[in-house]
Structures are given as C-alpha cells and as structure tokens.
Amino acid sequence: MGQLIFNQPSEDKSALEDAGDFTPRFDDRGLITAVVADAGDGELLMVAHMNAQALALTIQTGTAHYFSRSRGKIWKKGETSGNLQTVKEIRTDCDQDAIWLKVEVAGHDATCHTGRRSCFYRTVTLREGKPMLDIVDDERHFDPQDVYGK
C-alpha cells in the first residue's frame, strides 16, 4: 500500500463545497478535527484530531487512527484495549476542515479511556451560579486499571 497524498485545498470556495476532490484543510499545526459517532445508533463517541498520515491510514486500512497532541504521535484507536474502531463511512464538512467518522467499535464497545462507551458521559449544568458536571452515563464497559494499568 503506497503513501496516500492529499492535494492542497482550492482557494475557490465552490470547488471545496461542490467538487469531487477530497482536499482536507489541515490547521496550522497540520491537524484536522475528527468527530466520531457510532455507525449503528449515531451516538457521539469522541472528538479527536488527525494529521495527514493518520487520515491516510484510516482511509487505507478502514481502522481509525488519530494523532495524539499530548504524546505527539499517531495511535490506532483500540490497539491496547481491543476496542478497535472499524470505519463504515467518512464524511467531510462543507469547507473540508473537519471530518465525521461513522464507526463500529469492537471489543467492549467502549470508546473512552475511562471504560465508558462515549467520552461524552457528563452534562454541564449551572448550580448556584457555578458551572458543574453531572455524570449521566456511568456504565463502564471495562476497568481501565485492568486494561491500561493506570
């Protein structure tokens, strides 16, 4: 499998919006935002970032790869936990600066490193003038200590 190269995005807005060429617009750090949802029920699972190499690997292999800003490297989602994400569909937004992955999650059907299905397991509420977090999905599909040793 050869290296997948993305062409530079067009300056022509209509070309970005209506043409058939996928020319992702990476930010000044070389990243694009990836919104990830379950292919079956549409639940929002996570938001991550990809560089060109992670996006190319995802397209070529059908398995989600992301770029870790904190570790400064690419990771295959679920490689340690067994919760690999098989990509069923990739969409891009109108100006091609974000992508939306629809995935099936293997293993424990959990995406979050906390063991939960989704990274979005809390709501933000206002109590006594202070923003607070409330857990709305506390079901853990695996124990992070067992999987990651943390």
From Swiss-Prot:
Pathway involvement of the protein, from the record: Amino-acid biosynthesis; L-histidine biosynthesis; L-histidine from 5-phospho-alpha-D-ribose 1-diphosphate: step 3/9
GO CC term (a single one): cytoplasm
Hydrolase among keywords: yes
Residues annotated as binding Zn(2+): C94, C112, C119
Cofactor(s) demanded: Mg(2+); Zn(2+)
Family matches, as PANTHER family: HISTIDINE BIOSYNTHESIS BIFUNCTIONAL PROTEIN (PTHR42945), HISTIDINE BIOSYNTHESIS BIFUNCTIONAL PROTEIN HIS7 (PTHR42945:SF1)
Gene name tied to this protein: hisI
Intracellular or extracellular location(s): Cytoplasm
Name this protein carries in UniProt: Phosphoribosyl-AMP cyclohydrolase
Cofactor binding remark: Binds 1 Mg(2+) ion per subunit. Binds 1 zinc ion per subunit.
